[in-house]
Amino acid sequence: MSFSSDTKDELARIYPEEEESKIAELAALIRTIGSISMYGNGKISLTFTTENASVARLVFKLIKDLFGIIPETMVRRGRYLKKTLSYLIFVPDTKIAEEILGKVKILNYEKGHIKLNYGIDQKIVKNSKAKKAYLRGAFLGGGSISDPEKAYHMEFITHNLEHGKDLSKLINSFDLNSKVIARKNNYVVYLKEGEQIVDVLNIMGAHSALLNLENIRVYKEMRNNVNRIVNCETANLTKTINASLRQIESINYIKETVGLDYLPPNLKEVAELRINYPDLSLKELGQMLVPPVGKSGVNHRLRKIEEISKKLKERRVQ
């Protein structure tokens, strides 16, 4: 199972205690996996469709507890290449469907006409627990999280721009920074920062998923730090090797053309050590001198040797 599926299974096991929270969560589920069918003579039915059995059980229980009815259920297997199971929760009775849609503030009657509310009615998210329940329902119905090993991305898919904007505002009321974009015929509310995704998981109550994500974040950060250190040390080592090769080349040129006795005693001493110990660092070379010399002092002498080699080459060309 994916990280996203595991998170949904965890969230679907959380059952709200307060009626306000139950209504809020059901409202979000209707917005994301619910469909309202309107027929002639003012008949209405309500259907939920999901591929997650845990989500289907949650919808069934919410409707049963809030409205005292047993909704119809059906399991359908996909055709052709897609053989996954779909779970349908069906409320065919117009009176009950209207009661549910009215309770969650999606359906209103104005002057004898039915009016659909596409946004989130503030009356159903008037407290913190209800907001969290709504967010949980929105994720269970239309949310997903990418594999945190690869990228940090959480999104909520909704079919309506007004609902997308309201959902983004609800998320951002917890000091987060979600954004809304259009994608094909839907709208996507998304977050891309690991820290903010952790916050959303905490808000929804997905504590196991949160801990897993935090562990992955810590591991990735440690791995990145190690890689940076290794890259830095590799770069420094390459720089040291290149400098050593350049210095040895200069010393050998002096040795082959005029001899090392051409150099002042202090430079000759360093030159001989560098040839005999090509792998030593400047600090280690300095410790072998009598008296010992610091890293900057050794570097200064070797640069002097390179300058002498360069002048000898220029003189030879002339």
UniProtKB/Swiss-Prot annotation:
SUPFAM superfamilies: Homing endonucleases
DNA-binding positions: 281-314
Disulfide bonding pattern of the chain: none
An annotated GO BP: cell division
GO MF term (any one): DNA binding
Keywords: Cell cycle, Cell division, DNA-binding
PANTHER family xrefs: CELL DIVISION PROTEIN WHIA-RELATED (PTHR37307:SF1)
HAMAP family linked to this entry: HTH_type_WhiA
Similarity annotation: Belongs to the WhiA family.
Stated role: Involved in cell division and chromosome segregation.
Protein name (record): Probable cell division protein WhiA
Lineage of the species this protein comes from: Bacteria, Bacillati, Bacillota, Clostridia, Thermoanaerobacterales
Originating gene: whiA
